[in-house]
């Protein structure tokens, strides 16, 4: 990848945020991505667009030729248990986690690449609902003993539900 492309949604989200820490993180993102590419032996490709609000997510190629995904995100509470949850699902309806790192204001995940056929947003809403319900049934499992996952009821209370 020549130069670093930033996803539009990430830029918009940071620009709307009054947190100077997030703006500093976005300014440091090119160096963060370079560090992760060196650390894990990756060649970065163009990020997925429009992207998310908290992370740079894009396809990468490992030195051994594997096609993976790098997710480098702003460190926030919702991201803290993402790798643990993916490992708990153990590739049953979720991608594999190959590596993770947390440093400064960054959480980084090296993930298996999942190449969908049709983006869900391109199908009628009733079909979207059916896919999501099927996936949720497939993903549900009891958390491991001693887990640190937040309880959904607590999240709902925190957002006023």
Region locations from a protein language model:
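Juxta-kinase regulatory segment immediately upstream of eukaryotic protein kinase catalytic domains
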Residues: 1-45
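Short strand-coil-strand connectors
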Residues: 38, 63-64
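Short, non-ligating residues that shape and space the ligands of small metal-coordination modules
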Residues: 145
């Amino acid at each position: 990848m020549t130069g670093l492309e930033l996803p539009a949604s990430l830029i918009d989200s940071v620009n709307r945020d009054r947190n100077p820490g997030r703006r500093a993180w976005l300014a440091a993102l090119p160096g963060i991505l370079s560090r992760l590419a060196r650390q894990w032996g990756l060649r970065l490709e163009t990020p997925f667009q429009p992207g998310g609000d908290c992370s740079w997510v894009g396809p990468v190629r490992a030195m051994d030729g594997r096609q993976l995904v790098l997710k480098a995100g702003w460190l926030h509470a919702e991201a803290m248990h993402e790798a643990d949850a993916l490992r708990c699902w153990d590739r049953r309806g979720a991608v594999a986690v190959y590596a993770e790192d947390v440093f400064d204001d960054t959480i980084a995940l090296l993930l298996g690449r999942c190449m969908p056929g049709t983006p869900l947003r391109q199908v009628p809403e009733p079909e979207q609902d059916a896919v999501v319900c099927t996936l949720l049934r497939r993903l549900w499992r009891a958390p491991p003993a001693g887990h640190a996952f937040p309880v959904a009821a607590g999240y709902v209370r925190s957002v006023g539900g």
